[in-house]
Amino acid sequence: MKAVRLHAFGGPEVLRYEDVPLPRLGPGEVLVRVLAAGVNPPDWYLRDGYTAVPGFNPPVTLPVIVGSDVSGIVAAVADDVRGFTVGDAVFGMIRFPSFGDSAAYAEYVAAPASDLARKPGGLDFVQAAGAPMAGLTAWQYLIALGHDAPNPFQTVPHRPVPLEGRSILINGAAGGVGHLAVQLAKWRGARVTAVASGRHQAFLREIGADDIIDYTATAPETMARDLDLVLDTVGGPSTGRFLRTLKRGGALFPVFLGFQDAQEARERGITVSMAQVRSNGAQLAELGRLLDVGAVCVAIDSTFPLAEAARAHERAASGHLRGKIVLTVG
């Protein structure tokens, strides 16, 4: 089969489209014929050797296939698998945050059955491939964590906060995690302030944002006040600026590493919490039901053939995405 692998770390040019062996099916696994694969930040973190994630240096054996998000058709199931049969349309985030010999940027993937859910009938394969990591990140930050694995970012488990009737600001609201978080927060009854470039204003209104701050015109931390929650999908060292927008007792949820203002957060009475998103087929099935009835939608920024994964990574690096980048397979 064809797959995209790394033989060395570096820029998009190190992504190699090449022949690799078909993955072997292990106990508890499903062989999926991949029709689309989502592109996510951990894909380019892996590609460049995690230089963008200081202090994070997991062991990686090269060559390695890239990617975690897939949608496709079940081609085979292990003898001990129940709930999936050959021909089922499925989607999922595979083995995240761990690694394996089989991954998403490929024509076939051997996936743990517990990582998969049936693809909603109202969703095409491209949209389905764009949903898993972004959707599960938003879900596990805002709705329910869904696992008891140790949190690598803090000593206590992440705990979502009630959303109904609360005011929430989402930074990076037009991006992959952000646009799904806007919709999930609205579904749970929150009032949502969306922060994004002004070019995304109509899109953000369409998906339910109550208020919009164009960060290219106004610093959002000077506009918003007395919020209950900030979900910062951009994160990094600048995420502390949102502390001043929160009321005492509020919460700041950075999605990416780099928060440096723990002392100020304590003085202001603000809870700061992060989560490590993990594969979860059951949660994905719940999200799938919302996608199927149109309560939540997946926006697609752009698509590229699997053979042009390098171009997809170049598009990601250019920034200002609206929704998800997806690779098409076959």
Model-predicted segments: where are they?
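Glycine-rich phosphate-binding loop and adjacent beta-alpha segment
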Residues: 233-297, 329-330
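Mid-domain Rossmann-like dinucleotide-binding core that forms the NAD(H)/NADP(H) cofactor-binding site
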Residues: 128-214
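Glycine-rich beta-strand-centered segment in the early N-terminal region that forms part
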Residues: 21-39, 51-97
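C-terminal hydrophobic helical "lid"/dimerization subdomain
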Residues: 1, 284-330
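A short acidic, Gly/Pro-enriched loop at the edge of an enzyme's catalytic core
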Residues: 222-229
